[in-house]
Curated annotation (Swiss-Prot):
Entry function: Transfers and isomerizes the ribose moiety from AdoMet to the 7-aminomethyl group of 7-deazaguanine (preQ1-tRNA) to give epoxyqueuosine (oQ-tRNA).
GO BP, sorted A to Z: queuosine biosynthetic process; tRNA wobble guanine modification
Keyword line: Cytoplasm, Queuosine biosynthesis, S-adenosyl-L-methionine, Transferase
Pfam family membership, one: Queuosine_synth
EC number: 2.4.99.17
Gene (name only): queA
Catalysed reactions, as listed in the record: 7-aminomethyl-7-carbaguanosine(34) in tRNA + S-adenosyl-L-methionine = epoxyqueuosine(34) in tRNA + adenine + L-methionine + 2 H(+)
GO cellular component: cytoplasm
Quaternary context: Monomer.
NCBIfam families: PRK00147.1 (NF001140), queA (TIGR00113)
Pathway, per record: tRNA modification; tRNA-queuosine biosynthesis
Similarity field: Belongs to the QueA family.
Protein name according to UniProt: S-adenosylmethionine:tRNA ribosyltransferase-isomerase
GO MF terms, alphabetically ordered: S-adenosylmethionine:tRNA ribosyltransferase-isomerase activity
């Protein structure tokens, strides 16, 4: 399969650069997997698509203010984007500067703080901070908005680029499907008899990296840390026993559940995953999906295509553009039920040069 099969033209005006006034006021495009039928709704209409006995699985990771500014002891300015917190004082980070810092060199953080560059691991730098990392980031860090939002972060982003149920600090990008849920909507979901469970996947900055190969099968995913607890395994089993559906809120919840069920059986799991779900890959756990609209040629669009079918997904995106849906992190959402027989892009016939 070619990466180019997953491209589409998106007007710049449809990129959502700010959140709406209320989380729940976004629009919802529903895609029925078995038929490909589309319907244009509001996000609060999601309640109509849920059934008593269903199980919704959310990602409770918390976005950390992972962007820091500072200077090397030699005076050169730099920007740090934390990719992963290793322990209380060490991180792996992307560092942007005119010259890369050398092992043993000191970095002075704007707003107060100091770090030492310990080692380089390919594109990432291991940094050790003099004080505990998470309190430092909360004090002087900036929210790591995605590159396509293309504006400085604002005070409101600390709240709005975060789900209302975020608990476990460690992500440098939000699990954006969850941004649409406010507390009253969660209470209404519970009142309908829908159960909830929480996994953790700390979303890394690699989620925004473009696919740099021509053939999908040649792509290697970045790794991210996740945890699927025994409570989630038990909740899924109970859902199956009562005839309910497992509904993943966001692609990170899908990747968590399917990573923990790679052999076909869901088991508790804690560790790194580099699972890459694209058309042709089976789904062992997830029956329905709440997700935002994703970037062209992204691995997330490929995951949705694997779930809903390639032609159905691309038709849905074309309809979303035609109807002016807002795209990406602060944009609108989809509710998709799984296609039982999804198809992949058709292989192009070789050209005849005779």
């Amino acid at each position: 399969m070619r990466v180019a099969d997953f491209t589409f033209e998106l007007p710049d005006s449809l990129i959502a650069r700010h959140p709406l006034a209320e989380r729940r006021s976004s629009r919802l495009l529903t895609l029925d997997g078995p038929t490909g039928a589309l319907a244009h709704r509001q996000f609060t209409d999601l309640l109509e698509h849920l059934r008593p006995g269903d199980l919704m699985v959310f990602n409770n990771t918390r976005v950390i203010p992972a962007r820091l500014f500072g200077q090397k002891a030699s005076g050169g300015k730099l920007e740090i984007l934390v990719e992963r917190v290793l322990d209380s004082h060490r991180v792996l980070a992307h560092v942007r500067s005119s010259k890369s810092p050398k092992p043993g060199s000191s970095i002075l953080i704007d707003g107060g703080g100091e770090a030492e560059m310990v080692a380089r691991h390919d594109a990432l730098f291991e940094l050790r901070f003099a004080e505990e990392v998470l309190p430092l980031l909360e004090r002087v860090g900036r929210m790591p908005l995605p590159p396509y939002i293309d504006r400085p972060d604002e005070g409101a982003d600390r709240e709005r680029y975060q789900t209302v149920y975020a608990q476990r600090a460690g992500a440098v990008a939000a699990p954006t499907a969850g941004l649409h849920f406010d507390q009253p909507l969660l209470e209404a979901i519970a009142a309908k008899g829908v159960e909830t469970a929480f996994v953790t996947l700390h979303v890394g900055a690699g989620t925004f990296q473009p696919v740099r190969v021509e053939q999908i099968e040649d792509h290697h995913m970045h790794s991210e840390w996740l945890e699927v607890g025994q409570d989630v395994v038990d909740a899924v089993a109970a859902c199956r026993a009562r005839g309910g559906r497992v509904i993943a809120v966001g692609t990170t919840s899908v990747r968590s559940l399917e990573s923990a069920a790679r052999d076909g059986e869901l088991k508790s799991f804690s560790g790194d995953t580099d699972i890459f779900i694209y058309p042709g890959r089976p789904f062992h756990v997830v029956d329905a999906l709440v997700t935002n609209f994703h970037l062209p040629e992204s691995t997330l669009l490929m995951l949705v295509s694997a779930f809903a079918g390639y032609p159905e997904t691309m038709a849905a995106y074309a309809a979303a553009i035609e109807h002016g849906y807002r795209f990406f992190s602060y944009g609108d959402a989809m509710f998709i039920t799984r296609n039982p027989a999804p198809t992949a892009p058709q292989e192009s016939a070789p050209e005849d040069h005779a």
